[in-house]
Amino acid sequence: MNFKMFRFVAATQKPLIIPVFIPHLGCKRQCAFCNQRDVTGVTEPTLEDVETAVKSYLSWSKPRERTEISFYGGTFTALPREKMMNYIRKGVEFVENGKVNALRCSTRPDEIDEERAEILKNSHFEVVELGVQSMSESLLGKMKRAHDAETVFKSVEILKKFGISVGLQFMTGFPYETEKDIEISAKSLEVLRPDFIRIYPFVPLKNTPVEREISSGTVQMHSVETILERTVTLFLAAMKLEIPVIRIGLPQSSDVPEIYPANLFQVVAAKAVSRLATEGETEFCIPDNFKTSFNMAKKEFPFLEKTEDSDS
């Protein structure tokens, strides 16, 4: 490493996110790994469902400095235009009556263009998350993503042009993935410079093409340890660039196999500290919410010591 202090960063703003799940809506194809309906356990929400969900969250959640409604789980900007606008109008109602501060959504990189970005910008959308998964051309093909890496670069550029914050969602450990694929994704962060990322270690969801390939013996899963180490590679690449990693792993549910530790984020961060120590890195700047990971790493490397720093 050729920099003096490795700085672990965390998201500085933690708004209350009110999720509205639109599982697989807008998706024009099925990626090899995806089954959003089983992951979320919900189907298409009506406008009444949206209103009920938002009001319910607002009624029992502790007030925070910021509150946002998020349309997750599908390809929001690929919805039929009138359906998308109906959801947007419902969200805008809550913004304009002062109940929430902004809207956000998730979508595919190939479903962002200047027209749609302008609609989002003019409708109080401040964050858009792109399901990138990988920046390796070969792996994108294996995942059946039907777009290339250049499309990701272009969509990020468009969103930034309109002043919309960008989050990127990556997958690690897909069965066809190689170490080189992860290195390509990690390196791409230097150009993409998202505002934050999420990392989802691979889980073989039921009724997905790749799960059937695993079951038939066509392809094998990587070991959990291999997947965790590749997750660490991407995690450290983000940390080096001071890009917050706001989540690691899918939410737990009855339809998501329990492959990884419940404290997955802490485990990955601890492995990151351990890797840095092994490589000879001697100074880390660790925010409060990484201290558990530091203590976990200290069990492996007892010589690690914590010192107070005014910048930490």
PLM-predicted stretches and their roles:
Residues 1-17, 209, 216-312:
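Auxiliary Fe-S-binding modules of radical SAM enzymes
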Residues 11-49:
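Canonical Radical SAM [4Fe-4S] cluster-binding loop centered on the CxxxCxxC motif
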Residues 22-24, 107, 286:
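Hydrophobic residues in beta-strands and at strand termini
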Residues 39-52, 58-60, 73-202, 206-226:
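Conserved non-cysteine loop/helix-boundary elements of the Radical SAM core domain that shape
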Residues 62-65:
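Glycine-rich phosphate/diphosphate-binding loops that line cofactor/substrate pockets in enzymes
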